[in-house]
């Protein structure tokens, strides 16, 4: 018998790679009439939460790693304070289920849920599971994953699940603007790894534009990106462009792009598959190499793009890869590979998986 879920709490925080799937889960559960509360660190003023009517509570946390004694004490104090506040919020909200989306930001909430014996589920977005998700999988009822190969890494039932994508309009001014150019290129570095792309990609694209005078670049520079400097590079190079810190209509940008140059976070990977957008992936070298594994999956398993490691990155290497990626036959083959893979992905929703496991 499938149990009715009335309330869920989502343990989340950190980068968009954790926030975006949490918001997609929230949307899916809200459509089922479920009351949803987000709990985690870094939610105040998070760009992914702007303009959304989201019920959330900020929960302190600390990174439980080796550090100087003073730093370690401060982090453990934040972690303990977060645990106490999370336990209080869970008592008030009284959810049927707590879902963790990885990162240490979710740790206090998962600890509190375990203490209160609230059923825990997890969602893993990457090909290499994060430490918090691996740790709590032994206590969880189940883990929903974005990509099937990662299911073998957990100590509880796991299933590839689908999440709804970010909302987008079929009549988008962005789509209309990009449709008037060819080729169209999207550059996106993510919420934390944009600087390297901001420093290298514009110069390479100015070189590429010599062969493609009608090229258009939609460059998402990230919250700390120097938008004005990037605009100057494109302007001096005679490239048509739009440069901004953040993009709310991301799906229309991807749908309208002939090529995406990006980091290899799980969210962008999932959206590239959905939009069937060929990509050049430059994985962020930190975080235990999970982005490199994500990139290898899209490039070598699926055949949807190419990969450049950051240590190999140069204007010459980028220019060569971009010119190859813009070849019409290359675009056609990579789109077909992405389409074939996406059509065979599991269609089971995370909501359905959780209901079945309870």
From Swiss-Prot:
InterPro entries for the chain: GlcNAc_MurG, Glyco_trans_28_C, GlycoTrans_28_N
GO cellular component entries: plasma membrane
EC number, as in UniProt: 2.4.1.227
Pfam families: Glyco_tran_28_C, Glyco_transf_28
Pathway: Cell wall biogenesis; peptidoglycan biosynthesis
Gene Ontology biological process terms, A to Z: carbohydrate metabolic process; cell division; cell wall organization; lipid glycosylation; peptidoglycan biosynthetic process; regulation of cell shape
Superkingdom to which the source organism belongs: Bacteria
Subcellular location per the Swiss-Prot or TrEMBL entry: Cell inner membrane
Record's bilayer topology term: Peripheral membrane protein
PANTHER family: GLYCOSYLTRANSFERASE (PTHR21015:SF22), UDP-N-ACETYLGLUCOSAMINE--N-ACETYLMURAMYL-(PENTAPEPTIDE) PYROPHOSPHORYL-UNDECAPRENOL N-ACETYLGLUCOSAMINE TRANSFERASE 1 (PTHR21015)
Protein name per UniProt: UDP-N-acetylglucosamine--N-acetylmuramyl-(pentapeptide) pyrophosphoryl-undecaprenol N-acetylglucosamine transferase
Organism of provenance: Chlamydia caviae (strain ATCC VR-813 / DSM 19441 / 03DC25 / GPIC)
Chain's gene name: murG
């Amino acid at each position: 018998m499938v149990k009715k879920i009335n309330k869920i709490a989502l343990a989340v925080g950190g980068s968009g790679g954790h926030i975006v799937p949490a918001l997609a889960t929230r949307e899916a559960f809200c459509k089922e009439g479920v009351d949803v509360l987000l709990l985690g660190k870094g939610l105040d003023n998070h760009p992914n939460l702007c303009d959304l009517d989201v019920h959330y509570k900020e929960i302190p946390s600390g990174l439980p790693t080796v550090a100087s004694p003073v730093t370690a004490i401060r982090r453990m104090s934040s972690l303990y304070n977060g645990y106490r506040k999370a336990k209080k919020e869970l008592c008030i909200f009284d959810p049927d289920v707590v879902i963790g989306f990885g990162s240490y930001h979710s740790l206090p909430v998962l600890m509190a849920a375990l203490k209160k014996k609230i059923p825990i589920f997890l969602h893993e977005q990457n090909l290499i599971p994060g430490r918090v998700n691996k740790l709590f999988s032994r206590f969880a009822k189940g883990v929903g994953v974005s990509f099937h190969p990662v299911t073998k890494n957990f100590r509880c039932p796991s299933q590839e699940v689908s999440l709804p994508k970010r909302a987008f309009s079929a009549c988008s001014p962005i789509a209309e603007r990009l449709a008037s150019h060819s080729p169209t290129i999207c550059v996106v570095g993510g919420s934390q790894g944009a600087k390297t792309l901001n420093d290298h990609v514009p110069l390479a694209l100015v070189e590429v534009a010599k062969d493609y005078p009608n090229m258009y670049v939609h460059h998402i520079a990230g919250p700390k990106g120097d938008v004005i400097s990037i605009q100057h590079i494109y302007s001096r190079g005679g490239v048509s462009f739009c440069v901004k810190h953040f993009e709310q209509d991301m799906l229309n940008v991807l749908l309208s792009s002939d090529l995406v140059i990006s980091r290899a976070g799980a969210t962008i990977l999932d959206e590239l598959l959905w939009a069937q957008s060929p990509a050049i992936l430059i994985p962020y070298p930190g975080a235990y190499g999970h982005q490199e594994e994500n990139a290898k999956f899209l490039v070598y398993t699926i055949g949807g793009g190419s990969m450049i490691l950051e240590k190999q990155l140069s204007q010459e290497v980028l220019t060569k890869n971009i010119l190859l990626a813009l070849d019409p036959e290359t675009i056609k083959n990579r789109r077909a590979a992405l389409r074939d893979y996406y059509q065979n992905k599991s269609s089971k929703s995370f909501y359905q998986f959780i209901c079945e496991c309870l």
